């Protein structure tokens, strides 16, 4: 997929936004062809140099940008020339979705395996053991805690897991 096509994809735009934040998004959304300095980017985009550097470093940490250093022979100053490498984004998104799938499966099991109690007044949720420790009273307000039904939450998680598996074409057995 070409740079332009990648950057038009709303999922990829959101991914980049999550990485670099709103101040770094102009840097991530307009990668120049070839090498560019952070100063050139800041001037071209009308951004603070620190915001550009922060975005570039985040992109670098996520293998979406590389740099090479040049030392000015007269002044000894280093110049960093940055290159964007967005070819890895689809693979990284897939890895992120697998992490999400794993985390959601763990959370679903936690929700299934535990009994919960809720203080209607404070909105605090307790596991059975915690509720029992407190004598089934909320430690914040003293009200009685009530059994909390989480079937809808588990069902919503199962639906989301199914959607993720479909998107990933994962061959994972759905537990009943």
Curated annotation (Swiss-Prot):
Superkingdom per UniProt: Archaea
Signal peptide per UniProt: none
UniProtKB keywords: DNA-binding, Transcription, Transcription regulation
GO BP annotation list: regulation of DNA-templated transcription; transcription initiation at RNA polymerase II promoter
A Pfam family the protein falls into: TFIIE_alpha
Alphabetical list of Gene3D superfamilies matching this protein: RNA polymerase ii, chain L, Winged helix-like DNA-binding domain superfamily/Winged helix DNA-binding domain
GO molecular function terms noted in the UniProt entry: DNA binding
PROSITE patterns linked: HTH_TFE_IIE
Subunit structure, as described in the record: Monomer. Interaction with RNA polymerase subunits RpoF and RpoE is necessary for Tfe stimulatory transcription activity. Able to interact with Tbp and RNA polymerase in the absence of DNA promoter. Interacts both with the preinitiation and elongation complexes.
Family: Belongs to the TFE family.
HAMAP family recorded: TFE_arch (MF_01909)
Database matches in NCBIfam families: transcription factor E
Function: Transcription factor that plays a role in the activation of archaeal genes transcribed by RNA polymerase. Facilitates transcription initiation by enhancing TATA-box recognition by TATA-box-binding protein (Tbp), and transcription factor B (Tfb) and RNA polymerase recruitment. Not absolutely required for transcription in vitro, but particularly important in cases where Tbp or Tfb function is not optimal. It dynamically alters the nucleic acid-binding properties of RNA polymerases by stabilizing the initiation complex and destabilizing elongation complexes.
Protein name as catalogued: Transcription factor E
Organism of origin: Haloarcula marismortui (strain ATCC 43049 / DSM 3752 / JCM 8966 / VKM B-1809) (Halobacterium marismortui)
Taxonomic path: Archaea, Methanobacteriati, Methanobacteriota, Stenosarchaea group, Halobacteria
Gene: tfe
């Amino acid at each position: 997929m070409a740079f332009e096509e990648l950057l038009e994809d709303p999922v990829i735009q959101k991914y980049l936004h999550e990485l670099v934040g709103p101040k770094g998004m102009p840097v991530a959304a307009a990668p120049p062809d070839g090498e560019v300095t952070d100063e050139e980017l800041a001037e071209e985009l009308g951004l603070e140099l620190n915001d550009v550097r922060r975005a570039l470093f985040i992109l670098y940490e996520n293998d979406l940008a590389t740099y090479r250093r040049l030392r000015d022979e007269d002044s000894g100053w280093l110049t960093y020339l940055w290159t964007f490498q967005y070819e890895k984004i689809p693979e990284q998104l897939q890895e992120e979705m697998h992490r999400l799938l794993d985390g959601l499966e763990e959370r679903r099991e936690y929700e299934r395996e535990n009994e919960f109690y809720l203080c209607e007044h404070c909105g605090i949720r307790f596991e059975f053991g915690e509720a029992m420790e407190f004598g089934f009273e909320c430690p914040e307000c003293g009200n009685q805690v009530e059994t909390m039904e989480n079937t809808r939450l588990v069902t919503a998680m199962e639906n989301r897991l199914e959607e993720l598996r479909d998107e990933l074409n994962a061959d994972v057995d759905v537990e009943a």
